[in-house]
UniProtKB/Swiss-Prot annotation:
Main subcellular localisation: cytoplasm
CC terms in the record's Gene Ontology section: cytoplasm
Originating species: Staphylococcus epidermidis (strain ATCC 35984 / DSM 28319 / BCRC 17069 / CCUG 31568 / BM 3577 / RP62A)
Family as reported in the entry's similarity comment: Belongs to the fosfomycin resistance protein family. FosB subfamily.
Cofactor entry: Mg(2+)
Keyword set includes Transcription regulation: no
Domain of life: Bacteria
Protein known as: Metallothiol transferase FosB
Subunit details: Homodimer.
């Protein structure tokens, strides 16, 4: 018995229609279905669910590093930054990174959920940690 993959990512949103537009227009999501309070999109090969929940306090989101990260090609990195700026997306200050840890852009959606666009892979991250984070214990080879 095993878990085979991430099934979907669900975001609680305050306004379904504006969130659909954000995920379609900004992240190039493909809208699959929408209803009164729920919509499904795909971004890359990832199923994104949006559930409208208007009366949920959203201020706790800004205090957490919790986020979802999507992969982008490194050659498109500057283009993505420009795209997000042109569309007035709330770009966050990223954490300091070693170049071996690849590149990331952090920003928020309309409800403050943190999203990352990252140029590295899991293998890249593990190789970086093996070289730079000698205090870490590794369990599998990549």
């Amino acid at each position: 018995m095993e878990i085979t993959n991430v099934n979907h990512i669900c975001f609680s949103v305050s306004d379904l229609n504006t969130s659909i537009q954000f995920y379609k227009d900004i992240l190039h999501g493909d809208l699959l279905v929408s209803g009164r309070t729920t919509a499904y999109l795909t971004i890359g090969h990832t199923w994104i669910a949006l559930n409208q929940e208007k009366n949920i306090p959203r201020n706790e989101i800004s205090h957490s590093y919790t986020h979802v990260a999507f992969s982008i090609d490194e050659e498109d990195f500057q283009q993505w930054i420009q795209w997000l700026k042109e569309n007035q997306v709330n770009i966050l200050k990223g954490r300091p990174r070693d170049i071996k840890d690849k590149k990331s852009i952090y920003f928020t959606d309309l409800d403050g959920h943190k999203i990352e666009l990252h140029t590295g892979t899991l293998k890249d991250r593990m190789e970086y940690y093996k070289c730079e984070k000698t205090h870490m214990q590794f369990y599998d080879e990549f």
